């Protein structure tokens, strides 16, 4: 792996795999380019490009749909362990760390964590429930983070969100809104995409996350294909705000969004380009695997060793590579959708 910086542009060259990565550390623009005549890389053999890191499982909202079942008794990841993770992440060539939880900004050493990540040459971001955003934290966010996201909680309180978003963006922070696509949000979001609320004026993008029935109830799953179709078609036509999806939504995107160029589509990146580290130092291909045997233990192995040699990661890569939908016209892009929770796939 070879690294070069041109201003805010980080260029990472993977010679053995015949591709390079262009990552703008200021804007977040990310491009993976294979060499002429070579296929797209299936995974990064050096280490994950992105790590989702849970630095706490503390959260006072205690939502019934929370897949981490975070609560007010949730534990914080010790700072000394975070330091060790960051050293190993830097050695593995990690480009971005997305902090989560729980509510990450309520970790008592959150500002110091942001500073340390950025000083390690890695770009931090985080998702918050909106609580505990002090001026000190927002100032640090504007200095160190590429972006931050606020999670959306129905019912929609316009006054609350407008006040919160005005405060955040007054610091010059690039702000995203994360919305879980589920039974009590899909119709509202379809309306928003057709008739933009004032909220959109403050957003860099709105990111939709497919609901996963982990730790919650399956009643939140949207299984009505007509509702899904109408929503994705509205997203396809929307020009009022930038729109993103998690890769768990791929089966819906390829079916109902016709204006998305294939080079902007990325199927499940778990164990291929990203990994999740829990606050108890277990490293999983995906955060939704917590509580399963699909992990490596950072108490006994290094981050890079787990990435390269762990059976959990090797087996999941193989599952993505081989468990495709034979005869499906979208197979080359979708790669079988979610290989861990088949029930979240939106195939008709």
Enumerate the predicted regions with their spans.
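Short, basic/aromatic recognition patches
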Residues: 257-268
